[in-house]
Amino acid sequence: MTQNDSMAELKQQALVDINEAQNERELQDVKVKYLGKKGSVSGLMKNMKDLPNEEKPAYGQKVNELRQTIQKELDEKQELLKNEKLNQQLAEETIDVTLPSRQISIGSKHPLTRTVEEIEDLFLGLGYEIVDGYEVEQDYYNFEALNLPKSHPARDMQDSFYITDEILMRTHTSPVQARTMEKRNGQGPVKIICPGKVYRRDSDDATHSHQFTQIEGLVVDKNIKMSDLKGTLELVAKKLFGADREIRLRPSYFPFTEPSVEVDVSCFKCKGKGCNVCKHTGWIEILGAGMVHPNVLEMAGFDSNEYSGFAFGMGPDRIAMLKYGIEDIRYFYTNDVRFLEQFKAVEDRGEA
């Protein structure tokens, strides 16, 4: 029997064995039998040493062609077996369409989103306009347009994330107020709130975060008085914390308002008697406010002899912490589903 006859017979037998394989395990045995390290095709290569040098290239080529042919048939058979196995599984599996489906888990609003929307709805009802602004802001609008020139010592009050010498992540939403007044070309009235994220170089802990949410409000018109500000803040406190709440104003300092005040609300937990929430003072600080500084009005193009206004700023993070008894601001930003799921129950009870 010649070498060609031997290869042809080996090929024919390999094709028969491949065709008769009933599963992937049997097919693997066939592969080892012919193409394995000690397989029949590998054995043919050992015969090459007995051939004359001029016959070795042609012989080696034929052996490789045989190997490739067998490998191709193995691959096709393996694909066929996989398809047959899949079809069998599909035929055996049945789905009872009458069974109830799995309950879909429906999410709920994030507590900060809920708080921001509650505050927005309150001010929309008072005729305010909601205005958005840039989170990446110019130094001028973040500071100088708000009566904070480069030499002003109050700039040390806020460590900022600067991108360039003139561009930074805004440290408050007040730049939106400055830009809005500038666009009005000195014509009132202006009645807006500006919700959004702000950024400061604070070390994250239970009460501080490098990123947090702020809502600021601004009213500019003729004959706006401190009493208008006080009445607005009283309404906000009662809507957010309960109808029996009272507020008190404490003198403070902000470069963009004069006079400036810190606003406290009577403690909703102890009713002013003193507890751990109010640190036994009976009062809880909720926001800062004041009458718009004449310099801010003038830089925005308003005549400070004709127009006056008030501004206030609050942190929805702090308000949400107070309302829901949350002790760590970091819970808002860590995406812990166990924490967030609790507010689904609040929503279901209609307390949203």
UniProtKB/Swiss-Prot annotation:
Its main location: cytoplasm. One of its GO terms (molecular function) is catalytic activity, acting on a protein. CDD domains: PheRS_alpha_core (cd00496). Pfam families: Phe_tRNA-synt_N, tRNA-synt_2d. Mg(2+) binds at residue 258. SUPFAM superfamilies: Class II aaRS and biotin synthetases, tRNA-binding arm. It catalyses: tRNA(Phe) + L-phenylalanine + ATP = L-phenylalanyl-tRNA(Phe) + AMP + diphosphate + H(+). Binds 2 magnesium ions per tetramer. Keywords: Aminoacyl-tRNA synthetase, ATP-binding, Cytoplasm, Ligase, Magnesium, Metal-binding, Nucleotide-binding, Protein biosynthesis. The keyword Nuclease does not apply. InterPro entries: aa-tRNA-synth_II, aa-tRNA-synth_II/BPL/LPL, Phe-tRNA-synth_IIc_asu, Phe-tRNA_ligase_II_N, Phe_tRNA_ligase_alpha1_bac, Phenylalanyl-tRNA_Synthase, tRNA-bd_arm. One of its GO terms (biological process) is phenylalanyl-tRNA aminoacylation. Its cofactor is Mg(2+). It comes from the Bacteria. One of its GO terms (cellular component) is cytoplasm. Its EC number is 6.1.1.20. It is found in: Cytoplasm. Belongs to the class-II aminoacyl-tRNA synthetase family. Phe-tRNA synthetase alpha subunit type 1 subfamily. Tetramer of two alpha and two beta subunits. This is Phenylalanine--tRNA ligase alpha subunit. It comes from Staphylococcus haemolyticus (strain JCSC1435). The lineage of its organism: Bacteria, Bacillati, Bacillota, Bacilli, Bacillales.
